[in-house]
Amino acid sequence: MQDPDGIDINTKIFNSVAEVFQKAQGSYAGHRKHIAVLKKIQSKAVEQGYEDAFNFWFDKLVTKILPLKKNEIIGDRIVKLVAAFIASLERELILAKKQNYKLTNDEEGIFSRFVDQFIRHVLRGVESPDKNVRFRVLQLLAVIMDNIGEIDESLFNLLILSLNKRIYDREPTVRIQAVFCLTKFQDEEQTEHLTELSDNEENFEATRTLVASIQNDPSAEVRRAAMLNLINDNNTRPYILERARDVNIVNRRLVYSRILKSMGRKCFDDIEPHIFDQLIEWGLEDRELSVRNACKRLIAHDWLNALDGDLIELLEKLDVSRSSVCVKAIEALFQSRPDILSKIKFPESIWKDFTVEIAFLFRAIYLYCLDNNITEMLEENFPEASKLSEHLNHYILLRYHHNDISNDSQSHFDYNTLEFIIEQLSIAAERYDYSDEVGRRSMLTVVRNMLALTTLSEPLIKIGIRVMKSLSINEKDFVTMAIEIINDIRDDDIEKQEQEEKIKSKKINRRNETSVDEEDENGTHNDEVNEDEEDDNISSFHSAVENLVQGNGNVSESDIINNLPPEKEASSATIVLCLTRSSYMLELVNTPLTENILIASLMDTLITPAVRNTAPNIRELGVKNLGLCCLLDVKLAIDNMYILGMCVSKGNASLKYIALQVIVDIFSVHGNTVVDGEGKVDSISLHKIFYKVLKNNGLPECQVIAAEGLCKLFLADVFTDDDLFETLVLSYFSPINSSNEALVQAFAFCIPVYCFSHPAHQQRMSRTAADILLRLCVLWDDLQSSVIPEVDREAMLKPNIIFQQLLFWTDPRNLVNQTGSTKKDTVQLTFLIDVLKIYAQIEKKEIKKMIITNINAIFLSSEQDYSTLKELLEYSDDIAENDNLDNVSKNALDKLRNNLNSLIEEINERSETQTKDENNTANDQYSSILGNSFNKSSNDTIEHAADITDGNNTELTKTTVNISAVDNTTEQSNSRKRTRSEAEQIDTSKNLENMSIQDTSTVAKNVSFVLPDEKSDAMSIDEEDKDSESFSEVC
C-alpha cells in the first residue's frame, strides 16, 4: 500500500524509525523528544494496520547495535532509548488506570504484544557465539525488566530458562547482566524455604541462583552485583554478610559502606550477636586500609548518627559485657571522632552508680588518653589513686559482702554486672598513676583483700594479679605477696576443716553421754569396764612420766612421728583456687628459679602434688604450673621432660593440649639443651610424640597446637630434622585433615613463611619435596580408585596443584632479603631433578601428565650452576626418549629442553669469551716480561720458536678433532635409543679419553719452561697466569 505521495508506507515507517535511532545515538539530550516521536509513529502505524511493520523495523534496527562492544557509547544510548520508550508506554497505561480511564482491550494488547514480540526477538541472540551480542541482549533485558510490570507466563518461563544458562556464561560481563535480570524475578516469600530447595527442582528460583553466584562465581564483579541486588532478609543476609571475607577489596569494603550502612538501626536487631562481632572484628583488622576506614566510618558516623549521637546507647547495642571487639570499636570511634572526647565528663556523683556501659567507657577513655598522651583529659576527668581504690572497694563490697538481695535471678544479674564493673576498674588500675605512695598502698590493700576472696571469678583473679604486679616494688616483693595469699587461702581451708571436725567430735561426744545416761541394767558392767580402761590409761601415763623424769625413755623419733596425726590437706576446690592464682603469678615472673626460694617451696607444697593428683582438673593446672616453672629453670625442665612426654602420650585431650604447649614453650626458651644428653630425654622420642599427634585426626585441637609449635621451632632452627618436617608438610596436604580448618590455616601461613625466611629453610624443603610429592601422588591415586562410597575424592588436592605449590615454595625469587646470588641459586633445580628421578616410580599416566605439564614453572637462569643444568637436561632427554608422552606433555618437555639447551649454549659462549680475554691478558703480561728480560735478537728467536710450537699445537688440535669425528660417526651408526645407564657409561669412556689427551698436554706444558739449550734457542710460553711466576723463578 502506498500513501498519496506514492511512497510505500512500510518504507516510510522504516525511514521514520531509522531517523529517530540515528538522532538518538548522538546524545542523551533529545531522548524525551525521540520517545514522543516513536510513540507517534507507533500509534499511526497501528491506526493504519501496520503494527507488525512497526514492530519488525523496530526489532531490525535494535538488532544493529547488538554486535557493538561494551565500551561503545552508541550501543548504550540506543539501549537507554529502548528502555525509556517501553517505560513511557507502561507509565501511560498505569496513569490511565489510576484516573479511571476506560482502556480498550486493544490499547493494552498493543503494549503487551509489542513487549512480548520484542523480548522473544531479542532472546534469539542469547545463545550467540559472539560475546558482544550476548552482552547486549542481556543488557536490553535488564533495562526492560526494570520498566514493565507483568509479562506472560510462557514468556516468563522462557526468560528464566535463558537466564539460567547465561548465569554460567564464560564471560563475566554477560553474567553480570544476567544477575541484573534475575534480581527482577526475586520473590521475598520464596526465601523462607531457600535452604529446602533441591538443585534438580524444575521450578527455578532466581534467589537461589543469586545465592549460588554470590558464593561461587570466580569474578569479583559478578559476586558484587549479586551481593548488592540480592534481597536482604533473614534467610539471605548471612550469604550477603559473608562477603566481608571476600578476596576482593571492593567487595569487602562495600559490605560496610553499602550493606550495613543501608540497614541503619536494623543492624543491631536483625544480625545475630556473634555475626555482628565478627563483622566488626574483620572490618577493623582487615589488611587493607580502605576496608578499615569504611568500618570505622560505619561505627563513628553512620551508627552513631542513627542513634542520635547517644554514645551510651551505642555501647548498649554493642553489648559491651559480652562482646570482645568493643574495645577496638570504641578506639576506632575515638580516632575518627576526637571531638567526642572533649564532650565526655565523669561527675563526682556518677562514681557510685556505674553501669556496665559507663564502666567500660571509663576504662576505654582512660587507656586511650594514656596511649595518646592526652594529659588534659586525664587530669580533668579521672580521680586520684586513693579515690579510685575507694570506688573499687565499694563495688567489691557490693558484690561479695551484700547479702540483702532476695530475688535469685536479680541477684545473678547484679553479680555479673558488678563483676564486670570491678574488672573494668581493675584494668584501668593496672596502668594508673601511683606516684602518690598513699594511693599505691591503698590500692594494694584493696587488691590483696580481693585476691584473698575464695569466690573470686577467674577473670578477676587474672587482672587482680596483674594489678598487684604493677603495684609491687619489685618482682621478689610481688612473688612474696602472691604466695602469701595462696598460703593463707590454703591454711584457712585446713583450719576450717579442723574446726568442722572438732564440731563433729563434740556432737558425737554429746550423743555418747546421752546414751550412757539412758543405759539399762547392763550399764553397770560397762561402767566397770570403762573404769578398768581408765585405770590402765592412768597407770601407763604415770609410768611414762616416771620414765621421762628418770631419763629411762626409750621412745624413738620414728615412733613419735608415726604416732602423730596425719597432716590435713586442703580440699580440691581450694587447690584449684591456689593453682589458678599461682599460674597467673608465674606468667608474670622472669627471675630464675634458683634466685627465688619461695617458688621452689611452692613447687614442693602445691605444684608437684597437683601433678600427681588423680583429679583431671587439678592435674591439668599442676602441669600448667609445672611448665611455667620449667621456663624459669633449665635443670627443672630437663628433669620433667619425661613426665610431660607421658602426659602427651597417655593423658586425656585437655591434658595433651596443655602438655604440648608446655613442651613447645620449653624448647622455645631453652632450645635443644633439654634433650640428647646424659640423664636427658632423647630428641627422637619427642619427635615421635609430635608425629603421633599430627597423625591423630581425632584430636584436632592438639593437631593445631602441635603444628603451630613445630612451625615456630623449625623457623627458629631449634628443630632441623628433615623427617619431622616432611611429616608437617604431608599433614598439610593429607585429605584426612581437610576438615580441620584451623590446622590448614596454620600450615597455609607458616610453611611459606618458613620457606621464604632463609635459604637453608628452602633447601630443607627442596630435599624433602620430591619424596612428599611421590607419597601424595600415591595417596591421591588410592583415593581416586577407592570403591568405598563414603570416601570423599575431592578432599585432597590434585598432584598438579601440589606440584605447583612445592615449586612456589622452592622458588629462590620468593626469599626475603634477597642478594645478588639469588639468580645463581639451584635449590629449585635440585628439587626438579629429584622429581625426574622418581618419575619412573609413578605408574599413573594421568599423574605423569600433571607433573610434566607444570614443569616449565621452574626458574631458570644462565647464572645457575652449569653441571646442575646439564644434569637436568640429561634427565629430561631420558624421559623424552624412553617415555611414551602425549602431545601436550611432549610439548611441555620440549619447551624445557629447548630452554635448557639455550642456557647451556649461552654459558659455553660466555666461558669461551672469558677464556679468550684471559689469554689475551696473559699474553700481554708475558710479552712485557720478556721484553724487559731479553734483547731484540732473543725476542726474534722466541717468536720463531713460538711459531713452531703453534704449528705443533695445530696438529694436536687436528688430531683431537679427528678423534671426536670418529666418535660422532660411531654414535650415528648406533642410532638406537640409549637408556640413562648406557649414556652414563659412554660419557665415562669419553671422559677417560679426554683425560688421556689432557694428560699429554699437561706434560707438554710442564716441559715448556726450560731455558734454550745449544741446539735450540726457542722457548714456548704457557697460557696460565701462574706460569709467569715459574718463568721468573727459572730466570
From Swiss-Prot:
The modification Phosphoserine is found at S198, S933, S981, S1008. Gene3D superfamilies: Leucine-rich Repeat Variant (1.25.10.10). Keywords: Cell cycle, Cell division, Chromosome, Cytoplasm, DNA condensation, Mitosis, Nucleus, Phosphoprotein, Repeat. Signal peptide: none annotated. GO terms for biological process: cell division; chromosome condensation; meiotic chromosome condensation; meiotic chromosome separation; mitotic chromosome condensation; mitotic sister chromatid segregation; negative regulation of meiotic DNA double-strand break formation; rDNA chromatin condensation. Residues 909-919 have a biased composition (Basic and acidic residues). Residues 500-536, 909-934, 959-995, 1012-1035 are annotated as: Disordered. It is found in: Nucleus; Cytoplasm; Chromosome. Residues 920-934, 959-973, 986-995 have a biased composition (Polar residues). GO terms for cellular component: condensed chromosome; condensin complex; cytoplasm; nucleus. It comes from the Eukaryota. One of its GO terms (molecular function) is chromatin binding. InterPro entries: ARM-like, ARM-type_fold, CND3, Cnd3_C. HEAT repeats lie at residues 113-150, 153-191, 201-239, 597-635, 827-864. Its main location: nucleus. Present with 1920 molecules/cell in log phase SD medium. Belongs to the CND3 (condensin subunit 3) family. Component of the condensin complex, which contains the SMC2 and SMC4 heterodimer, and three non SMC subunits that probably regulate the complex: BRN1, YCS4 and YCG1/YCS5. Regulatory subunit of the condensin complex, a complex required for conversion of interphase chromatin into mitotic-like condense chromosomes. The condensin complex probably introduces positive supercoils into relaxed DNA in the presence of type I topoisomerases and converts nicked DNA into positive knotted forms in the presence of type II topoisomerases. The condensin complex probably also plays a role during interphase. This is Condensin complex subunit 3. It comes from Saccharomyces cerevisiae (strain ATCC 204508 / S288c) (Baker's yeast).
